[in-house]
UniProtKB/Swiss-Prot annotation:
In the hair cortex, hair keratin intermediate filaments are embedded in an interfilamentous matrix, consisting of hair keratin-associated proteins (KRTAP), which are essential for the formation of a rigid and resistant hair shaft through their extensive disulfide bond cross-linking with abundant cysteine residues of hair keratins. The matrix proteins include the high-sulfur and high-glycine-tyrosine keratins. InterPro entries: KAP. Expressed in the middle/upper portions of the hair cortex, in the region termed the keratogenous zone. Belongs to the KRTAP type 1 family. Keywords: Keratin, Repeat. GO terms for cellular component: cytosol; keratin filament. The keyword GTP-binding does not apply. Interacts with hair keratins. The lineage of its organism: Eukaryota, Metazoa, Chordata, Craniata, Vertebrata. It holds the Pfam family Keratin_B2. This is Keratin-associated protein 1-5. It comes from Homo sapiens. Residues 3-172 are annotated as: 15 X 5 AA repeats of C-C-[QEPVRC]-[TPIVLE]-[SRHVP].
Length: 174
């Protein structure tokens, strides 16, 4: 299997044909059950697949990707690979937090911290009425960061909440 260094919306995918398609991941992220194509109806680790064109592309993922080593938001149940495996993203242009992806030294220890674009879903998929966007973060963002603190992010398909609440899921009562 051949993999590229590009990821789709911050989430790795791979080419089952053994060649690099429009969205491939680094070899460390590649697993046989990860990111199968052909369906925009399924979700990736609880989040809808994202397509900039609004149609199903080769980058759509199935939930089985959540069972193996993939980069994913913190609200997913499975423990997956380190964020460093998704250094490049094709999320799009608009970003909700931060101005872009940067790589540099942070903190007194001098450790390198990699900032990643994590995509929130396309409104055409889940009816959130929010445009596709990215959150730039060194760590997987919270549901509210991804969804601009909208009540819709309390949906089970987003954060694993048991029900939707009329108030924002960032509030303590959620």
């Amino acid at each position: 299997m051949t993999c590229c260094q590009t990821s789709f919306c911050g989430y790795p995918s791979f080419s089952i044909s053994g060649t690099c398609g429009s969205s491939c991941c680094q070899p460390s992220c590649c697993e046989t059950s990860c990111c199968q194509p052909r369906s925009c109806q399924t979700s990736f680790c609880g989040f809808p697949s994202f397509s900039t064109s609004g149609t199903c592309s080769s980058s759509c993922c199935q939930p089985s990707c959540c069972e193996t080593s993939c980069c994913q938001p913190s609200c997913c149940e499975t423990s997956c690979c380190q964020p460093s495996c998704c250094q490049i993203s094709s999320c799009g242009t608009g970003c909700g937090i931060g101005g872009g992806i940067s790589y540099g030294q942070e903190g007194s220890s001098g450790a390198v911290s990699t900032r990643i674009r994590w995509c929130r879903p396309d409104s055409r998929v889940e009816g959130t009425y929010l445009p596709p966007c990215c959150v730039v973060s060194c760590t997987p963002p919270s549901c509210c960061q991804l969804h601009h603190a909208q009540a819709s992010c309390c949906r089970p398909s987003y954060c694993g909440q048991s029900c939707c609440r009329p108030v924002c899921c960032c509030e303590p009562t959620c």
